[in-house]
Curated annotation (Swiss-Prot):
GO terms for biological process: gluconeogenesis; glyceraldehyde-3-phosphate biosynthetic process; glycerol catabolic process; glycolytic process. Homodimer. The active site is at 96 (electrophile), 169 (proton acceptor). GO terms for cellular component: cytosol. Its EC number is 5.3.1.1. NCBIfam families: tim. The lineage of its organism: Eukaryota, Metazoa, Spiralia, Lophotrochozoa, Platyhelminthes. The keyword Isomerase applies. Keywords: Gluconeogenesis, Glycolysis, Isomerase. GO terms for molecular function: triose-phosphate isomerase activity. It comes from Schistosoma japonicum (Blood fluke). Substrate binds at residues 12, 14. This is Triosephosphate isomerase. It catalyses: D-glyceraldehyde 3-phosphate = dihydroxyacetone phosphate. Pathway: Carbohydrate biosynthesis; gluconeogenesis; Carbohydrate degradation; glycolysis; D-glyceraldehyde 3-phosphate from glycerone phosphate: step 1/1.
Length: 252
C-alpha cells in the first residue's frame, strides 16, 4: 500500500457471537499491542454494539453491519444511522455481498444507504465485488464500475469521500477458502484507483483506501498487504479467531 494512506483492517463478525464469546474476543483485542499506523474496526451484530463499544479501547472503531436509508419511521426490523451514533459507534458497513445476494439489495438501495449514512455523520465501508460467473465471463471491471457509479452519483464532495473506505470483495472468495492472488487483488485495486481518478473529485484517488475482503487469513495477509493499492482488509471468519490480531499486524 501507499505510505500516505493509513492501513485499515475491519473485522466483520456477521451473525456470530454471544456475550460470553464477545468477552473473549474483546479481551484478546485489548491485550494486543497494535501499531499506531493501522486503523482497526469491529463490526458487531446490532444487539451487541453498545456493549462492544463500551468494552473496546476507543482507538478501535465499532461499526454496524447495515442500516437503512431514512432517519426513522415504520420500517420494522431496520435501524438508522442516528441510532448507531446514539450508542457511540461511528462506522457502518454497507453493500456487503451477503446483503446484495441474500436480501436482494440493489445498487441503488446501497447507494441511498451510503448517502444517508454520510449525511448523518457516519463513516462507511462500502462493499463492491463480482461473482465467480461474472469473473469467468470477464465482467469484473464492469460489475465494480456499475456498483461504484451508483455510489459516486450520491457523493458530491471530497469531504464525504474522506469518510468512505471501499472494500473490494470478490464474492467467489468469501467464506470459500479461495482467495484472490496478490496479483489478482492488485490488478483490480489498481483499476479501481484509476477509476476514482477519472470519476471523482481531484485527489480522491490517492487518499481513498481500497481494502480487500475474501478469505483473508494470517497465512496470506502479509503478501496481500505488500501490494501497492491494497490498503487493508475486511475480514470475516478469521475476525472471530486469534489470528485476527496477526492480520491487524500485517503491515508491521
Amino acid at each position: 500500500m501507499s505510505g500516505s494512506r493509513k492501513f485499515f483492517v475491519g473485522g466483520n463478525w456477521k451473525m456470530n457471537g454471544s456475550r460470553a464469546d464477545n468477552k473473549v474476543l474483546i479481551h484478546s483485542l485489548s491485550e494486543a499491542h497494535f501499531c499506531g499506523d493501522t486503523e482497526i474496526l469491529i463490526a458487531a451484530p446490532f444487539v451487541y454494539l453498545n456493549e462492544v463499544r463500551q468494552s473496546l479501547a476507543k482507538e478501535i472503531h465499532v461499526a454496524a453491519q447495515n442500516c437503512y436509508k431514512v432517519p426513522k419511521g415504520a420500517f420494522t426490523g431496520e435501524i438508522s444511522p442516528s441510532m448507531i451514533k446514539d450508542v457511540g459507534c461511528d462506522w457502518v458497513i454497507l453493500g456487503h455481498s451477503e446483503r446484495r445476494s441474500i436480501f436482494n439489495e440493489s445498487d441503488e438501495l446501497v447507494a441511498e444507504k451510503v448517502q444517508h449514512a454520510l449525511a448523518e455523520g457516519l463513516s462507511v465501508v462500502a462493499c463492491i465485488g463480482e461473482t465467480l460467473s461474472e469473473r469467468e465471463s470477464g465482467k469484473t471491471e464492469e460489475v465494480c464500475v456499475r456498483q461504484l457509479n451508483a455510489i459516486a452519483n450520491k457523493i458530491k464532495s471530497i469531504d464525504e469521500w474522506k469518510r468512505v473506505v471501499v472494500a473490494y470483495e470478490p464474492v467467489w472468495a468469501i467464506g470459500t477458502g479461495k482467495v484472490a492472488s496478490p496479483g489478482q487483488a492488485q490488478e483490480v485495486h489498481n483499476f479501481l484507483r484509476k477509476w476514482f481518478k477519472t470519476n471523482t473529485p481531484s485527489g480522491v484517488d490517492q487518499q481513498i483506501r481500497i481494502i480487500y475482503g475474501g478469505s483473508v487469513t494470517a497465512a496470506n495477509c502479509k503478501e496481500l498487504a505488500q501490494q501497492h493499492d491494497v490498503d487493508g482488509f475486511l475480514v470475516g471468519g478469521a475476525s472471530l479467531k486469534p489470528e485476527f490480531i496477526d492480520i491487524c499486524k500485517a503491515r508491521q
